[in-house]
Amino acid sequence: MHDQRTVRELARQYDRLAGQYDAAMDRIERWLLGDWRAWAAHQAVGRTLEIAIGTGRTLPSYRPGIVLIGIDVSLGMLRVAQRRARAYGRPVTLLRADAQALPLRDASVDTVLSILSLCTIPDDQQALREAYRVLRPGGRLILVEHVRSDRRLLGLAQRLIEPLSVRFAHDHLAREPLPMVVANGFQVLHEQRRLAGIVQRILAVKPS
């Protein structure tokens, strides 16, 4: 059972941050992700679910024809995403929902996309199980996440700092999604790291 108290705390945290989030993230994201957010959006096909859509920073990068659903636990973030969707003329269905218990039918989407969200979801394995459940056979899982570095000393430093980042920001610095993606039945098609291995992108599929 996932931690509903932590989910409520996350919602309150991001409700407070919603108005300032984009200004704070603009410079950080350019350094952290480069063009990887656009890369992720360009891999999406068909009916696409974006987990923890936040303020909708990916919206401008989706290709025409994508049928988009975005979920987030924070109403404040969703309100900003709605304004961004209107500004870009991007149709999107926005839902207040938890990635650990998706309000979608089995095998109902073609793509599940997550950018910098598995680090804060309390039970990341449950989120991946839910992604697998709602994906159609052959559907795509697209992840861009900050992760534990594959460089030994940096990875160790992340482990040492992680208790503080979790306590004060609900941010897990040293998670390793790739083994969990494989363990949950996905077939990995592409994996790449940047910034000394602390950022990772993954493209995987649910077997047909």
Predicted regions and their residues:
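Conserved class I S-adenosyl-L-methionine
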Residues: M1-A44, R57-T58, V80, Q158-L164
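C-terminal alpha-helical "lid/dimerization" subdomain adjacent to the S-adenosyl-L-methionine
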Residues: R8, M25-R27, R129, I142-R201
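Class I SAM-dependent methyltransferase SAM/SAH-binding core
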Residues: L49-A101
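Short beta->alpha hinge that forms the Motif I/post-I loop of the SAM-binding pocket
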Residues: V73-L75, D123, H146
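A short acidic, Gly/Pro-enriched loop at the edge of an enzyme's catalytic core
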Residues: Q100-V112
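A short SAM/SAH-binding and catalytic strip from SAM-dependent methyltransferases
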Residues: T111-D123
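A short glycine-rich, Lys/Arg-flanked "PGG" loop and its adjoining helix->strand segment in the class I
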Residues: Q125-P137
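C-terminal lobe and adjacent flexible extensions of AdoMet/dcAdoMet transferase-like proteins
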Residues: R201-S208
